[in-house]
Every structure is written in structure tokens, then in C-alpha cells.
């Protein structure tokens, strides 16, 4: 598969920028020679249920990026209404086809994931069961989310 020169140039520039700026303390690496697959470690925000956790996120950049949005997954999935419990796929409003803007960059995507840990988007829920708990038994939902973050303080190395 041959990637277009514009794609390569843009993605290399964005990678360099994210690695030097480290928005929100997010660390980014490429697990292989492919510019299409990024791995990031996202710290749990201090003012969130995920405080203290460190979460591995995989970003897949499609060939026609920036016309098409990247896809994002938590590996392993985290306990969050916007994350599929089975695949880790992140449901973030501005990553949907109709809301995606080609002027956005991968740094925006990672910042959006970080912000999602602070403020979930119920309108973009990935799982109906979690959404019901979020609305009907918020204390239990919050306890499970906190617990999942605590469990992720030490075991991140198993996934990197």
C-alpha cells in the first residue's frame, strides 16, 4: 500500500508536533513503521473519575485523512459511556462523519479523548447498559469508573 505524499507530510508534521507539545501530558509513539497506527498514553485528568489512571489509546489514521476522521480505541476498553466495552472504540461527537472537519488534527482528537474523561457525551454513548447506569445509578457508575482507573495505575506496561 502506497500512501500519498500529502498524507505522509501532514501526518509526519502532526506526529512531530504532538510528540514535542505533549498536550495534557499525552505521550505518543508509533508501534511500527506505519504512519497510520499511533499509540498514545493518556493520563487520567485530575478533575475526573479517571484520576491517577494511565490509559493506552490506539489511533488509526485512514489513507484519506484529513477528509475522513481517525478512529480511536482504548486498549483495553475503559469503563466509560463513550467507549465500547467489547472493542474499546471511542464514540466522540466530532469524530462522526457529518461532524468531522478536515481542519482538525490528531492533536485535537487526543485532546477530545482527554476531555471525554472529564465530561462524557451521553448523546454519543457507545453502550446502552452503561448509559442507563450513568443516568439511573450515577453513584454506581462513578464507583466502577474510579475502580477501573485505579486498576490501570500499574498495569499499563502489559499493554504497551
Model-derived features: where do they sit?
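UBC/E2-like fold recognition across ubiquitin and ubiquitin-like conjugation systems
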Residues: 1-160
Amino acid at each position: 500500500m502506497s500512501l500519498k505524499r500529502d498524507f505522509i507530510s501532514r501526518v509526519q508534521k502532526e506526529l512531530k508536533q504532538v510528540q514535542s507539545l505533549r498536550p495534557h501530558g499525552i505521550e505518543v509513539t508509533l508501534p511500527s513503521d506505519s504512519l497510520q497506527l499511533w499509540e498514545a498514553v493518556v493520563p487520567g485528568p485530575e478533575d475526573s473519575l479517571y484520576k491517577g489512571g494511565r490509559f493506552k489509546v490506539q489511533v488509526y489514521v485512514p489513507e484519506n485523512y484529513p477528509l475522513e476522521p481517525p478512529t480511536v480505541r482504548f486498549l483495553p476498553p475503559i469503563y466509560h459511556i463513550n467507549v465500547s466495552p467489547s472493542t474499546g472504540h471511542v464514540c466522540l461527537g466530532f469524530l462522526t462523519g457529518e461532524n468531522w472537519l478536515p481542519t482538525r488534527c490528531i492533536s485535537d482528537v487526543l485532546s477530545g479523548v482527554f476531555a471525554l474523561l472529564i465530561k462524557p457525551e451521553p448523546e454519543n454513548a457507545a453502550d446502552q447498559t452503561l448509559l442507563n447506569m450513568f443516568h439511573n445509578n450515577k453513584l454506581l457508575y462513578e464507583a466502577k469508573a474510579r475502580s477501573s482507573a485505579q486498576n490501570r495505575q500499574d498495569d499499563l506496561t502489559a499493554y504497551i
